[in-house]
Curated annotation (Swiss-Prot):
This is Inosine triphosphate pyrophosphatase. Binds 1 divalent metal cation per subunit; can use either Mg(2+) or Mn(2+). It is an enzyme of class 3 (hydrolase). Homodimer. The gene is hap-1. It comes from Caenorhabditis briggsae.
Length: 184
């Protein structure tokens, strides 16, 4: 049996590493295409990125859009987390909730996949509920040090990567992608 090849369009080395670890048994190749940053609902953003990526790659592509949503703020920063994190860092994200009793949040990951130009785009979403805490642990991957998933005493930044890759929003979305591949 040959491995299914997946062209994952990302410029984020840490995301690529996690996707490769979660999709063991697949041949994941990184394609670095500079995609536009779209605004809107996360599923719309993922679909637009997938359309743009397939036009550049001219073959099967997988793209991802990640959100970190604070319940006290009606879901913000949501899909704009990249910009918030760039400017505020994990400490600033935590401090955003200083005036709120509700520190609950959820991490959401939307993958969009298509076999090629003119083919349908399939969307796979995963969510991980948790709370925003003072940053702890490894600070090398985005907001991981300030997100503590429900049922755990550790932040994503403190967790063993194998544990994180079993429970994360990314792994939940990729589990749905694997199910799709098993059927198609």
């Amino acid at each position: 049996m040959t491995l299914r090849k997946i062209n994952f369009v990302t410029g984020n080395a840490k995301k690529l590493q996690e996707v490769k670890e979660i999709l063991k048994g697949f041949e994941v190749t990184n394609v670095d295409v500079d995609l536009n940053e779209y605004q809107g609902e996360p599923e719309f953003i993922a679909q637009k990125k997938c359309q743009e990526a397939v036009e550049a790659v001219k073959g099967p592509v997988l793209v991802e859009d990640t959100s970190l949503c604070f319940n006290a703020m009606g879901g913000l920063p949501g899909p704009y987390i990249k910009w918030f994190l760039t400017n505020l860092k994990p400490d600033g994200l935590y401090n955003m909730l200083t005036g709120f009793a509700d520190k609950t949040a959820y991490a959401q990951c939307i993958f969009a996949y298509t076999e090629g130009l003119g083919k349908p785009i399939h969307v796979f979403a995963g969510k991980c509920p948790g709370q925003i805490v003072a940053p702890r642990g490894d600070t090398s991957f985005g907001w991981d040090p300030c997100f503590q998933p429900d049922g755990f005493e550790e932040t994503f930044g403190e967790m063993d990567k194998d544990v994180k890759n079993e429970i994360s929003h990314r792994s939940k979305a990729l589990d749905l992608l694997k199910e799709y591949f098993e059927k198609n």
